[in-house]
Structures are given as structure tokens and as C-alpha cells.
Amino acid sequence: MTTNTSELSAAGVSIWLDDLSRERLTSGSLQKLIDEKNVVGVTTNPSIFQAAISKGTSYEQQVSELAAQGADVEAAVFQITTQDVANACDFFAGIAVASKGVDGRVSIEVDPRKAWDTQGTIEEAKRLHAAVGKDNVHIKIPATLEGLEAITETLGAGISVNVTLIFSLGRYRAVINAFLLGIEKAKANGHDLSQIHSVASFFVSRVDTEIDKRLDALNTDEAKSLKGKAGVANARLAYQVFEEVFSSERWALLAEAGALPQRPLWASTGVKDPAYPDTLYVTELVAPNVVNTMPEKTLDATADHGVVSGNTISGRYDEANGVLNALEGLGISYNEVVALLEKEGLEKFVASWKELLDHVQDALNSAATKGSES
């Protein structure tokens, strides 16, 4: 039976779920999304884990065991999150095998407090990879300037990487270069390049949220006509960069050696403004060799009424450039916006991580008290 999500998959878009919890793994809800809505991967981030662990009861037994072992909060969070990701990797093992590792992938992010620490990120990436112990795990590394070298070194060690928090075209080019350097290093180190997978997570809706605020402040007809267009335009131009770099001679040499391209991944695809169609960042960003990671609400909307009408990216680059040029013409600085979004994105993840640590610390204390009373 043809469905909206199966049509999206047929158009070249891998559907990943931007959510994970132990309850999803044990209740069958994740399996249902795999079976019915063509989900072929999962992404996580500090905010997702913070929400899952603070709201659910599925973690109480493990927290009690960790408290009995005298685990500190950092070790406890590491064990809880890597266990969830390892279990999710098992859910997707069949898809990973069938797709030769391109899909069936589960992402786990390095501690966001290390986003500005190159060596700390490299060490954490290797530790997470070893702890999860699954071939289909992606280690998420933020695309900070300090993260670029960490991306190269992690890939060079043969570890698959999801580069996250990309907002600008300039940074995206730097990320692709870090990827190419990493694959070249992996080749020199003797790794099987066909086993190294990478995606570059380009954030979409947050661009509109910030730029729309500035357009609203201008309150002109031209400003109003540009609302809700920047995020899609920015992502489409990122795909143009992808097409350009991955048809280059430099890439051809690596592809001959078995390397696989780093696919663009559309992240932050939940629509924030109710005035826009709730599938905007799905149906307007369809092209071969991309991933779209969706919150469940967006996935449900896509399955229900997301009309897939072929490739909606290629050949629309002049239109996309026109949007960004018009914004600059109104005095809205692209570079200022993307720098702010990176800063805010990292701050949100660090805040969520600290909330997660606080919650698990409280749970450990409570479990230890109960243990001493029994």
C-alpha cells in the first residue's frame, strides 16, 4: 500500500524519528513507527534524554541499581543514555543490514559542555562509541569551530559521525571539508571506508523563527512576504553545496576507495508558527540522498496529509538565493542570525544536560535513601 511516508521514502528521503525513550523501546511504539510510517533511524539530543528520563518511570530500576553501586551522576547518565541507544540500535539492526549501514542508525551526542573542547570531544566520542558497541551508532558532534577538528579525528578513527547544529552555508562547507579530511585520514589509517557513515544536520525551523521575529519588527509588506521562507531557502542552498562537493574530483577519488557521501539531514523540522503548514519542512525539502529527522507530531502530520510531489529542492537555487538576498536588502544580517542560533542552540543543550544531571542526581539520592531504609 502506498502511503505519504512510503512516497517520501521512494523520493529519496530517509525518515528518522527525532525522539527516544526507554518507554518507546519497551511499549512497541517505536516498532509501530518502523512498521507503519517508514521510520528507518533515530536521533537523540540532550533535550530528548532530559524529557524522557524526567517524565518516565522506566528508569527507576536502573537508577536504584546504580545508586546501590555508588555510581556518581555523570557515570549514571552515561550508562542510562548509552543503554537506551544500544537497545535502539538493536531495533534497527535489520534495517542497517538491508541498507548496508546507510539507514538503521541511532545518534547519541557528546556532552554538550565539551562543544568548545576539541580534545575532550574526541575522547568522549570514542568513549560513547565503545560503550554503545554497535555498528549502527552515530556519534553526534556539534559543528562549532572547535568541533571541526574533532569531526575529522573521530571519522579518521573509523567512527561514524552525525554533525549537528549547522545553521549556515559557510559552516556547512567547513563541515564537509572536515568530513573529507576525516575520510582521507581513515583511508590512510587502513579503515574500511564503506563502513563509515556520516550525516550533516542542518537546522531549518529555528532559522525562520529568528528571521521572522526581525521581519515582524520591520512590519512592511516586503518583510511580510518573506516570512516563513528563509529556513527552506537556506536548506535548499545547502543541498546545492552537497551536490557540488560530492560531484568533485576530490570526492570521486574517495568514492572509488569505497567512501560513502555525507548526507544532508534536515533537523529542527517541527513547525513553530501555526500559520504555516505543519509539514512545511518535510514536503518542501524533498530530494534524493537526504534524511529528515522529525518529532512524532511532524511525522504524524506527514503520514496524514503530507503531499509528496517529487523533488522540491533541485533547480530552485535562484529562488532560494533571491530570498536570502532580499533579507540582506532589508538589513537582516544572515551572519548575525546564524551565529546567534548556534550560540542559543548550544546553550539550550547545555541547560538540558544540566537539568538531566540534576534530575538523575535527585533520583540517585532518593534511591540511596530508600536503600538505606530497607
Curated annotation (Swiss-Prot):
Its main location: cytoplasm. It comes from the Bacteria. GO terms for biological process: carbohydrate metabolic process; pentose-phosphate shunt. It is found in: Cytoplasm. Keywords: Cytoplasm, Pentose shunt, Schiff base, Transferase. Pfam families: TAL_FSA. One of its GO terms (cellular component) is cytoplasm. GO terms for molecular function: transaldolase activity. Pathway: Carbohydrate degradation; pentose phosphate pathway; D-glyceraldehyde 3-phosphate and beta-D-fructose 6-phosphate from D-ribose 5-phosphate and D-xylulose 5-phosphate (non-oxidative stage): step 2/3. Its EC number is 2.2.1.2. The active site is at residue 140. It catalyses: D-sedoheptulose 7-phosphate + D-glyceraldehyde 3-phosphate = D-erythrose 4-phosphate + beta-D-fructose 6-phosphate. Belongs to the transaldolase family. Type 2 subfamily. Transaldolase is important for the balance of metabolites in the pentose-phosphate pathway. This is Transaldolase. It comes from Renibacterium salmoninarum (strain ATCC 33209 / DSM 20767 / JCM 11484 / NBRC 15589 / NCIMB 2235). The lineage of its organism: Bacteria, Bacillati, Actinomycetota, Actinomycetes, Micrococcales. The gene is tal.
